[in-house]
Design a protein with these regions (language model features):
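Hydrophobic faces of well-ordered beta-strands that scaffold small-molecule active sites
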Residues: 1-2, 76-79
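Flexible loop/turn connectors
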Residues: 81-84
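Terminal-tail/helix-coil boundary detector
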Residues: 23-54, 69-73, 87-129
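Glycine/threonine-rich phosphate-binding loop and adjacent beta-strand/alpha-helix elements that clamp
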Residues: 62
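Short glycine- and Lys/Arg-enriched binding-loop motifs that mark or flank ligand-binding interfaces
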Residues: 5, 9, 75, 112
């Protein structure tokens, strides 16, 4: 079961280097979400937006469709409190990514270096335990 299949919201395409989070938002302590790192990491999201537009989908739908295409036993479980996000989440199941699409996504992702650790140092020590 993928944890945070939208990269804590980053793959929705709505977060960039100008985004501010509420003071209590966990992303404030995540190195990957510093302004500098968001600025560097937005390159993949911009590519994802373009790819999604070609598929008449949102970046979030493509991210979920990609996960669904990986293995039949991989099931992203999205969380939402908004009706329109629920509809968007369900729409990902209707997107068929071809083998060529998957190669294109993988190629784009491999060409972009992700900046910043996924968790603060103290939490990284607990990953994969």
């Amino acid at each position: 079961m993928p944890f945070s299949p939208l990269g804590k919201g980053f793959l929705t395409g709505t977060i960039d280097d100008k985004t501010t989070f509420e003071p209590t938002d966990f992303r404030n302590v995540v190195p990957r979400f510093t302004e500098e790192n968001r600025k560097a990491n937005v390159a993949f999201v911009e590519w994802l937006k373009t790819f999604a537009a070609r598929k008449n989908a949102t970046p979030a739908q493509i991210a979920r469709a990609w996960l669904l295409a990986q293995k039949p036993w991989i099931v992203p479980i999205p969380g939402t409190t908004k009706r329109h996000r629920l509809d968007e989440n369900l729409g990902a199941a209707n997107i068929q990514l071809t083998a060529a699409d998957l190669r294109e996504i993988d190629r784009a992702a491999s060409q972009i270096e992700v900046h910043g650790a996924r968790y603060p140092e103290a939490l990284l020590k607990m990953v994969d335990r």
